C-alpha cells in the first residue's frame, strides 16, 4: 500500500458536508450523463454465475470473491469485478435499439486491488453501454463519446462550485487525445505511470488510447481484459490532480470487441479456452449488438470535484492502518 499524505492538507468540507456533496454529485451527474449519451438507468446484479463467463477477468490474475448458494448446489457464484460483459448482453435482452444505451449504479469487490489514495477493494462506478453499428466501430466514435463525458464532468464542476464553492477543484477546459505508443515515444525512459503523470501535468486532461497490446518496446502500457474492449479502440480519461501531484483515472472505456478482435486478443494472452463460454459464443455468433461502453468511478469523481486526498474520504471501506 502506497499512501500519500499531502503537506498542509485542508479537506475544506466537514464529514457531514462531504456526505451532502457526494449525494448531490451522484444524483446530478447520473441524470446529466444519461441525457447526454441517451442512456436509461437499469438495476444491476451484484453477482453472476461463474460458468456464464460474464464476470470481468480484469488483468487475468485477480480472483473474484466467490461462494455457493443453498438452492444451487455446487454452482460457483462470483461477486462482480465490473459489469463490462453483462451490460452488452443486457442491451440485447432488454431490446435496446440503435444509439440507445443503459447505465447502472455498479458496486463491486476487488479483493486483490493494490490499495492507495485512489484504489479501494470496494468499487463504485457508473457502468454504461450503448448500441452502435458495425460501421461506427471507429476512433472518431470513441472520441465523440469521450468529449460528451468530459462535457458532463465540466458541467458538474460548475454545479458543485455553485453549491459548495469552498471545495471546488478547478479542472482544465480541454481534453487531449494521444495513444500509448505516442506517449512511449515521447517518454521512452519512463515507466507507464510516470508517462501518464508527465503528460497529464503538461496538458491537464488526456484521453490515453489503445491500451492492451504490446508497444514497440515489447511492454504493455497496462493490462486489459481481452474479451470486452477492442485494444485498438479503447482508452482512459486521465486528469492531473494537484492535491496528490499525480494523474487520476476517472474513466476506462472503449468500443467493444467483435469476433475477430476478441479471438486475436484471447490468443495474445493465451486465454482461448474462454471461447467456449456462453458470452464469448454470443460474440462469435453475432448474437449481441456492437457496442461502446465503460465505467466512470463515482468515488474518484467525487474526489476530483471536491479536492479530496483519499478515496476513503468519499466512500466507506477498509484500508490497512499504517
Swiss-Prot record:
HAMAP family: AsnA. PROSITE patterns: AA_TRNA_LIGASE_II. Its main location: cytoplasm. This is Aspartate--ammonia ligase. Pathway: Amino-acid biosynthesis; L-asparagine biosynthesis; L-asparagine from L-aspartate (ammonia route): step 1/1. One of its GO terms (molecular function) is aspartate-ammonia ligase activity. It comes from the Bacteria. InterPro entries: aa-tRNA-synth_II, aa-tRNA-synth_II/BPL/LPL, AsnA. It catalyses: L-aspartate + NH4(+) + ATP = L-asparagine + AMP + diphosphate + H(+). Belongs to the class-II aminoacyl-tRNA synthetase family. AsnA subfamily. Pfam families: AsnA. The keyword Amino-acid biosynthesis applies. Keywords: Amino-acid biosynthesis, Asparagine biosynthesis, ATP-binding, Cytoplasm, Ligase, Nucleotide-binding. The keyword Secreted does not apply.
